[in-house]
Amino acid sequence: AYTLATHTAGVIPAGKLERVDPTTVRQEGPWADPAQAVVQTGPNQYTVYVLAFAFGYQPNPIEVPQGAEIVFKITSPDVIHGFHVEGTNINVEVLPGEVSTVRYTFKRPGEYRIICNQYCGLGHQNMFGTIVVKE
């Protein structure tokens, strides 16, 4: 059941945990520079590096093509956050220093709202982002 659940949801099992230094993640690399955050890794595959911080997401908006396999790699430099994309089964907890990885293919174009569903401080209720899926 665990294998089916993790495969169906597109979640990478915990044995493949990736880590980053939360004190320097904003200084260099794909999480620090929104211009480097969306990387085409194959003919119809993209990796998106998302930084969840108090109280927002970077990059914002995130633009991806419809029908492509998207691998989100999400981390935080400060506190625990959530990364839930409304209208999808994407829902991961984001811990400082750890990279939460999830795969998803958007079958429909449009705008999808990202919300933080882990209380992260006084501005939590304003923590939103947007994914724009283009045809």
Curated annotation (Swiss-Prot):
Topological category with respect to the lipid bilayer: Peripheral membrane protein
The species this protein was found in: Thermus thermophilus
GO terms assigned for molecular function: copper ion binding; cytochrome-c oxidase activity
PROSITE patterns hit by this protein: COX2 (PS00078), COX2_CUA (PS50857)
One Pfam family matching this protein: COX2
Coiled coil ranges: none
Catalytic activity: 4 Fe(II)-[cytochrome c] + O2 + 8 H(+)(in) = 4 Fe(III)-[cytochrome c] + 2 H2O + 4 H(+)(out)
Protein name as it appears in the record: Cytochrome c oxidase subunit 2
InterPro entries: Ba3_CcO_II_C, CcO_II-like_C, Copper_CuA, Cupredoxin, NosZ/Cyto_c_oxidase_sub2
